[in-house]
């Protein structure tokens, strides 16, 4: 798993959850 992809996924989830 690409760390960058994971980071982006978490960021998207955080933004959507915000």
Curated annotation (Swiss-Prot):
The keyword rRNA-binding does not apply. It comes from Oryctolagus cuniculus (Rabbit). Binds the chemical odorant, 2-isobutyl-3-methoxypyrazine. Belongs to the calycin superfamily. Lipocalin family. This is Odorant-binding protein 2. One of its GO terms (biological process) is sensory perception of smell. Monomer. Keywords: Olfaction, Sensory transduction, Transport. The lineage of its organism: Eukaryota, Metazoa, Chordata, Craniata, Vertebrata. The keyword Transport applies.
């Amino acid at each position: 798993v690409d760390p960058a992809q994971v980071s982006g996924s978490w960021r998207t989830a955080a933004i959507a959850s915000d």
